[in-house]
């Protein structure tokens, strides 16, 4: 692709750029090479000085961070600290609290982001001989009130449990890991969002003294505090000190996983894949283990942590695995008793291992829509403060990155930008994509009224979640975060990447990733299952779940086990709930006419608890938190789409469980009609809010340069038909595919059949053949018999040769309770009992009316 800067700019200036077209502050969101660094505070000093001249900005360098004395005559009310991990922030906080509490009998509220961090900080407060602090773990009653809680550590999700009068009397508010604490507002576990948002906002506005610290403090936070407290009350400390354990660490990105090395070792083969020249992830790990070194391994997924453990156990029995399926292990001192430590993001802020004991660290990072974001990965990598050989080897598994062309990488590597720059043919496109994303984020969650903090940081949250669709974007974000902690980052041939116009990590990765992913799946299938399907239905939690969600008569044991195993993952839980809500709205037509009825259905299915079956075979429960996820208007559009597809309906004459869970023979024009015109239902906005998917608008994708650059950054090489944009029909098919796959767990695949519909052509009835002929505009005059019409249809077979698609719901879709009911709702097919009870609480005035009375046919 060749173009001059001006031509490239003209080629891509289309819809979506309005959010950044005014220049100034908004233009910063259009810089694809510096956007990640800006969101994590790399430009904090410059932006604060320019936007808030009255804010005191203090730079510290070459030594651990130090907080300004709380007793100084010129001490400001609000102190904000930005300093890397391992720079001594918590130690400085303890000194500051010791000084403040030594002079006055002040009350203190410490708000944390994680339970583990609360426990660790409580221990450090106790070890520092500070006045006793209570924690919300110790509370004997749900509401914490009285003098016993004047000095309290509480997780942000439990802030509503603090007595409101007590909450207004705290003298000092401490927010260690403040950006992570604010990020919890978007967590699916945040059950009382409006209440917590209001309480935290009030604390920030009224608490006499505030200390907020984080390694990634950005200008958004300072803007908020300056607006609430006045710029003259804010003191910002920016410290660039990093301990030797980070400063000397070097991160190398492995180009290959070495799945064959893993497989060969697990099978006991003598020749275990040494042909990769020692460059792969598992070859390097094997070399360390053979040398008798101590290693730690981070994994984004539980499954890979278990596979890595099996690999390491072939070298040494001294392996400790910490993931969500294993018993919790909060004693970091025990880590020195093992040769191999393997952990997931269960080990994050609050736990730190300071000993120089492990020789090297290995990290398996898999960006995926429901996986940990890159900030969580960065924080987990920072738990090991020192390495003997200062070696960090990272492998990026891009197999879960979205392949659809509507998912476009939008970030350029900042090192390449600083070392000669990216070609304008790249930067003009990616800057536009950043603007398009900014424009999409602006109206997001507008239905969330009464929230003060949630809207302020929604862009950063959506940025962190949406970029997980791209391995390239995720790599660039992690690179910026590690550089923020002064970790050396080595990526083969990175500095010459702009000459090839492709990120080295991506080159060839699209070709290799299916094979590597298949190898891992095959190995995972070999992990024995300790659980039996028998008896699951008798478990109390499973029985209650079945009464609420599943069809009468129960589900077959094997199908129930498969469902409960799937529900152990947050992605499957979300999709299960979404499909239940959709089915409920399909079978209660009033939901399409009344927001209150819709809300009743949504609250019924999206709240409470569901049982899950862990990999260890234990039945546990996972809480559902109805949040700001569904736009009713979008749901109504999806309901219309499902009705048109005939999904979740009983097939005529079938058995009770013969449910339509698939639609076949879908043509591109039919899909375009289902998705609707751009001015209709905004499914792209729906996907952004529900599934955290950033769909590039059709007008942007119609431009050839955008498609070509996205293909290069995604590792697909040059796009087919270079210079040609994505057509409207192809864009609609991609959106349709993402809707059903990401929101409901369905699968859309190309079909091999020639004619539309699910029936085989030789089984078509006469009226069905007539309908097909008329659809194609074929003259059937003089043909009356079935045979004549069939021959006529087959003679025009070429007219039906356009691409066809099949959509199939997940297998557990037919287990849902409403699925076995009649094809049309009515008195003979009422909602299942628990939903009917929930809807009984909806006042009659909110139900649809007919001639001034309740329309009983719609109930």
UniProtKB/Swiss-Prot annotation:
Membrane-spanning segments: none
Protein residues bound to ATP: 83-90
Coiled coil region boundaries: none
Domain of life where this protein originates: Viruses
Family to which this protein belongs: Belongs to the herpesviridae OriBP family.
Known partners and oligomeric status: Homodimer. Interacts with the major DNA-binding protein. Interacts with the helicase/primase component UL8 and the polymerase accessory protein.
Protein name: Replication origin-binding protein
Organism listed in the record: Bovine herpesvirus 1.1 (strain Cooper)
Taxonomic classification: Viruses, Duplodnaviria, Heunggongvirae, Peploviricota, Herviviricetes
